[in-house]
Amino acid sequence: MSLSDKDKSAVKALWSKINKSADVIGNDAVSRMIVVYPQTKTYFAHWPDLTPGSTHIKAHGKKVMGGIALAVSKIDDLKAGLSNLSEQHAFKLRVDPANFKILNHCIMVVISSMFPKDFTPEAHVSLDKFLSAVALALAEKYR
């Protein structure tokens, strides 16, 4: 699925409104993922504290949203722009790519609850397409 110019503009516009809250969004999304999808805890078993908002959760949420920020900046070529992250997740971290979709859903839930006026139906569709494209780009090295 490719992103239209309209989708790209909508994602960039939404990102410009939410990027100041990226760390909070990341923390809340990762916390939500671990609570709602407990099977994802297996990737973080080496952390001493998996409670929502813990130091490790916050740090990982910040990393995740840093990756989303990178993706927004590389929106015209996500496959090339996220190549290093794809390689890291495929070969070093060995994350099942199905988990990207789970985290994407959690990110959208958090954004929609934090920014209800900005999360219009159009923004929702464009962000969903964008995050799906990010998941696809991250899964590229698994093939």
UniProtKB/Swiss-Prot annotation:
Please give the InterPro entries that the UniProt record associates with this protein: Globin, Globin-like_sf, Globin/Proto, Hemoglobin_a-typ, Hemoglobin_oxygen_transport, Hemoglobin_pi
Cross-referenced SUPFAM superfamilies: Globin-like (SSF46458)
Instruction: List every position bearing N-acetylserine.
Output: 2
**Is-annotated flag, keyword Metal-binding?**
yes
Is Acetylation given among the entry's keywords?
yes
Where do the annotations place O2 binding?
Answer: 60
Q: Which GO terms describe its cellular component?
A: blood microparticle; haptoglobin-hemoglobin complex; hemoglobin complex
Gene3D superfamilies for this protein: Globins
Which residues are in the Globin domain?
2-143
Q: Where are the transmembrane segments?
A: none
Q: Per its record, how is this protein called by name?
A: Hemoglobin subunit alpha
Q: In which organism is this protein found? A: Pogonophryne scotti
